[in-house]
Every structure is written in structure tokens, then in C-alpha cells.
Amino acid sequence: VPANCLLPMKVGPCRARVPRFYYNSSSGKCEGFTYGGCGANANKFQTKAQCEKACA
């Protein structure tokens, strides 16, 4: 699993409420979360398919 996929999910401080996906290293699956629009890390993908291609 690439290092960016092991980063914790990070919503960020903004309040844009953008649907995104991240790799949950505990469950081994890509899961949805609501991204605030700024201040995230590299464990953030536009689609579940992109997340799975990169991490799962």
C-alpha cells in the first residue's frame, strides 16, 4: 500500500462539503467522507474507483 494511502482521513478546516473518498487502512477499503475543500492530505480521491486503483 502506498504511503499516501496510510495517511489518516482529513476533512480540513474549510466548510465546502465536497464528497470524496479515502483509503481506510484499518478496514482495507476505500470509504466516503465529506471534504471541507482545503487543508487535506494525499489520501483523498474524487471517486471510489480512483481510490481503489491507487490504494486497494
Curated annotation (Swiss-Prot):
Query: What is the scientific name of the source organism?
Result: Anthopleura fuscoviridis
Further information: Does not inhibit potassium channels (Kv), as well as metalloproteases, and cysteine proteases (papain and bromelain).
Classification via PROSITE patterns: BPTI_KUNITZ_1, BPTI_KUNITZ_2
Top-down, what is the taxonomic lineage of the species of origin?
Eukaryota, Metazoa, Cnidaria, Anthozoa, Hexacorallia
Read off the Gene3D superfamilies from this record.
Pancreatic trypsin inhibitor Kunitz domain
Q: What is this protein called?
A: PI-actitoxin-Afv2b
Where does the BPTI/Kunitz inhibitor domain start and stop, copy by copy?
Answer: 5-55
Coiled-coil portions: none
What subcellular compartments does it reside in? Answer: Secreted; Nematocyst
**Function of the molecule:** Serine protease inhibitor that is strongly active against trypsin (900 IU/mg) and moderately active against plasmin.
The tissues in which it is expressed are: Expressed by acrorhagi.
Which residues make up the annotated site Reactive bond for trypsin? R15, A16
